[in-house]
Amino acid sequence: MAEIMHVFAREIMDSRGNPTVEAEVFLDDGSHGVAGVPSGASTGVHEAHELRDGGDRYLGKGVLKAVENVNEEIGDELAGLEADDQRLIDAAMIKLDGTENKSRLGANAILGVSMAVAKAAADSAGLPLFRYIGGPNAHVLPVPMMNIINGGAHADSGVDVQEFMIAPIGFDSFSEALRAGAEVYHALKKVINEKGLSTGLGDEGGFAPSVESTRAALDLIVEAIKKAGFEPGKDIALALDVASSEFFKDGKYHFEGGEHTAEEMANVYAELVDEYPIVSIEDPLQEDDWDGYVALTAQIGDKVQIVGDDFFVTNPARLKEGIAKKAANSILVKVNQIGTLTETFDAVDMAHRAGYTSMMSHRSGETEDTTIADLAVALNCGQIKTGAPARSDRVAKYNQLLRIEQLLGDAAVYAGRSAFPRFQG
């Protein structure tokens, strides 16, 4: 296999106008890979450390230190290593960093190189990235979890829940599911307009109307699904990313004008699941509320996917504890939460072996990089969350999945309803 010859990084811009790291890896056979690193708005306290410069430049958000760490340390460490040994390469960067959360070199520096190495190795092997990572059995296209109403930390809409998503489950192909999602998105704009509400967009391309409650937002989406000619629950289901750590203060959940305990929030979710065709609820409780997650999973986990994002932070150690305690039943997969592809692979593998589902995910600050689209297919996630069918930073991932589906031809299988085995709607 080709050896790593040169590693280089630069500072580029993300979709929120903030700097991020882009890494390039060149191999001795002329192959090369490039990768841009995403960044989140609502970040878990247990995430790998994103290194920022501080100071006045870019309001403290510059990443020149991370870029320097790639160009002056990581590149020298990896020179001469075989590019197809992803585990060895990632382990070398983790060892070089020397901290538990990648805070010395920066997870943004390490991840950029980790992804670029995989792309360079795929280029050298003459394979698309999904095939290089996933092997011959990578053929399942994920359900697009399309965030069409933005709230919480992603918008100024006033609603506490961060994301209201649609899941087009009743279709035979990814391309048809994407079409249906886009049609609902456009129908939703009309519904919002007709009610005299704002059609301004949040960070992830979803609308950010000022609505009074979670139910009001869900009602808008159900109306849009019907307006587009689809049946809620049969053709298109609903999903939530509550991001509840964002409104957890002083031991209480400050939700929709009241202060609630974990038990009370669990009852709120149970009622919503009974009233609406909801297949998935992400981060329903604060990220360290282990007892609450265990109780919630026991209460409604047999009929809805309970996803750990801030709760698990794509970390195999936290996931292992969750599996042992039967806390949640699904993991959100964000490569920059853990900082290397290898650790991401390990988390997804652990989840699937335990019967947990997995959802590949973008961040609210994205680039045109499409790595997560390939990863969703390679790792057989069955679900991908990468925003509304709007804004090029989101649509880039959907377009890559369309290319993958076309490349697979008759071998392509759309996950559809099978991605949500607990859903009875």
From Swiss-Prot:
Positions binding Mg(2+) in this chain are: D241, E282, D309
Q: Which GO terms describe its biological process?
A: glycolytic process
What does the record give as the active site? E204, K334
* InterPro entries assigned: Enolase, Enolase-like_C_sf, Enolase-like_N, Enolase_C, Enolase_CS, Enolase_N
Q: How is the cofactor bound?
A: Binds a second Mg(2+) ion via substrate during catalysis.
Q: What is its main location?
A: cytoplasm
Spell out the family assignment given in the record's similarity comment.
Answer: Belongs to the enolase family.
Q: What is this protein called?
A: Enolase
Q: Which organism is it from?
A: Corynebacterium efficiens (strain DSM 44549 / YS-314 / AJ 12310 / JCM 11189 / NBRC 100395)
What is the gene name?
eno
